[in-house]
């Protein structure tokens, strides 16, 4: 299937993000260039590297939202990380290579899901057979002659890394007929609420040291997971829920994980995208403390990843040569030139995102596919209340949000969420007890509820 064109990508982003056309175009072109590169001969492909993007702009103007929506649009492995979470090598914390390992995990998840779809019908059939056997169990054999054989089979299975072998059973004609009847009812969906006892793999217990080890790039549970036998527990569940769990287990048995890992590594390396947020927070612009040294160290650790290197993952080595990196930051107290020169050079495309105007706020309230106003209307619809905003009310909300941003810290579109929550506080509180009907939010109501916010000079409680 042909990839989405740059114009189609921008059109999709327009459904959720107001303005910032330059940023949308840059991202769309970079994404489509991946498709162009894939059409070229291999000897040419290897010399064409992605043009990484650096987005700079005030907080709340859409940088992170562009990344979030990209993940929904592109059919490629995508991870978003925060630069402030990383520490340079030698310090306690996450090392920068963990972002590449996260991308590998995401690629495996995507490919695994695709492979599961291919074997889903077969897995459902096998799960239904298991359910029939559980609902109408056979007669278990228990004689001295086969006890030694069962013991040998059990030992062989455990040594091979499998679980306990299934017990042999005897199926009489009566049981066979009952199973045929139950199988027919299962197919017709008549037994979905019947309870059945199944054995499922026990979920791993939370390890207090797990988070610390994970931050240091060491996932011991994953490393040892395949070596240790899987413990199973019995659960009593309705047939519908039991089938889902059994289908998941059957799908894992039917797919070839070696192929999945190989495809995933190839996809992550050729079409993966890593979005690095808050990159301005690791600049060394502030020289007043020793933190600048550590921040510059993080930049130097990120540099080889962005330049192109090979990172070891639990699925195999992953090359970052053709991964697209998109970095973003507000740069309120620093500027892109405060990054080390080598790292600046690895982000050749610079995009400046503009501060939001009052007209932008009006569009943000109304235009996006799931705008804030539409969200509140849907929430109150659950109580049987029809919420309506007049055009004048929307204009006034945008005006107040813009004024508060100008008078205090400018937090962009995030200010609208604070303003709307204050405006609709009473309606949301009384909503469940109101009789079904329509509530119209007018300009006068907005002024009544929010006038104090504009008049009061101490607006700290309205800062997110």
Swiss-Prot record:
Classification via Gene3D superfamilies: 1.10.8.60, P-loop containing nucleotide triphosphate hydrolases
Cellular component GO terms, alphabetical: HslUV protease complex
Keyword check for Cytoplasm: yes
Keywords: ATP-binding, Chaperone, Cytoplasm, Nucleotide-binding
Residues where ATP binds: 18, 60-65, 277, 342, 414
Any one Pfam family match given in the protein's UniProt record, by short name: AAA
InterPro entries (UniProt xref): AAA+_ATPase, ATP-dep_Clp_protease_ClpX, ATPase_AAA_core, Clp_ATPase_C, HslU, P-loop_NTPase
Domain of life: Bacteria
Subcellular location: Cytoplasm
A biological process term (GO) from this entry: proteolysis involved in protein catabolic process
Annotated function: ATPase subunit of a proteasome-like degradation complex; this subunit has chaperone activity. The binding of ATP and its subsequent hydrolysis by HslU are essential for unfolding of protein substrates subsequently hydrolyzed by HslV. HslU recognizes the N-terminal part of its protein substrates and unfolds these before they are guided to HslV for hydrolysis.
NCBIfam families recorded: hslU, PRK05201.1
Assembly notes: A double ring-shaped homohexamer of HslV is capped on each side by a ring-shaped HslU homohexamer. The assembly of the HslU/HslV complex is dependent on binding of ATP.
Name of the protein: ATP-dependent protease ATPase subunit HslU
Lineage of producing organism: Bacteria, Bacillati, Bacillota, Bacilli, Lactobacillales
Gene: hslU
